[in-house]
């Protein structure tokens, strides 16, 4: 198969092992952990062109390119990562990873627990926070020899990680890009997450999180959780244009099977998601969202938290995003302006809702490209090999 000229093409994930104990915010300790990572582009001689991509709730390390010749879908942010794209792999060395607690190769609930005869962690996997993720990402940076990132970029939950980076490691990034995110969850967002969790926890096949030991899987609960979540990712206008009140068969069937096209879509999305995602991971990810609040250690003041930062910021929101509305991004911008920090803010008129950050919307992509600029360039020799 021939790939598009602006694609990074075939990519091979790498697994990095960390043997030192990892102390987590919850008080638990992981004796060791692994991170699944993909890289695109070439690291230059002075390690100055590295960009870290932080993923959202259902994301992972496969952000761009293809794993196999016959893959029909590219990585989740392929629209923005590649030769000549906004995150230009001709200029930048891009690193994407699957966070701990995930289910795509990094240590998580499906991984063997060395303290329990290598049975899957399941519900025994500790709850992790955004700060824990950023800590592991910093350890990955050390392993790669990258003392300072040219940029740390993320959308949604990924944007929260980028924000945490700027507070916890202010001297280790030059630019921070926070997209469709928030400085902490609202009560409504926590409520959405709780409904999703309860749909999983109440599934008879959940077995208190030990479904793998029972050769079972809480598929119904995970499908429902994804359906609830997916509604919040779309705008009303997008749903109106895509589905309206269109009927699947053209007429009312007067029953409880699928009748409206939007019902069919939600069931399909839930079904597809349930085939590829772990239920315990979903619980962990939503709790990490709930716990996120960088102001917590700064007298509940986001302004005081952002006073620690030293980098440039790009903050992007989308007009129809009601999960993380533009006002939430403006809270971050206001805190930065109060501290006289360099920040560019863009509110993009887009109809796709919260998921807008995944689409190559022209103004959004153009702004991201311009912000990253051309300051970093590859040195001809030597090139750095990552092991």
From Swiss-Prot:
Described function: Transfers a succinyl group from succinyl-CoA to L-homoserine, forming succinyl-L-homoserine.
Catalytic residues identified in the record: 156, 321, 354
Record PANTHER family: HOMOSERINE O-ACETYLTRANSFERASE (PTHR32268:SF11)
Main location: cytoplasm
Chain sites annotated for binding substrate: 226, 355
Domain AB hydrolase-1: 49-358
Site residues by UniProt (Important for acyl-CoA specificity): 323
UniProt pathway: Amino-acid biosynthesis; L-methionine biosynthesis via de novo pathway; O-succinyl-L-homoserine from L-homoserine: step 1/1
GO molecular function: homoserine O-acetyltransferase activity; homoserine O-succinyltransferase activity
Keyword Cytoplasm: yes
Consequence the record notes for mutating residue 323 to L: Can no longer use succinyl-CoA as acyl donor, but can use acetyl-CoA
Group of enzyme by EC: transferase
Organism: Acinetobacter baylyi (strain ATCC 33305 / BD413 / ADP1)
Catalytic reaction list: L-homoserine + succinyl-CoA = O-succinyl-L-homoserine + CoA
Record has Transferase as a keyword: yes
Protein name: Homoserine O-succinyltransferase
Family assignment from sequence similarity: Belongs to the AB hydrolase superfamily. MetX family.
Lineage of origin: Bacteria, Pseudomonadati, Pseudomonadota, Gammaproteobacteria, Moraxellales
Stated regulation of activity: Requires MetW for activity.
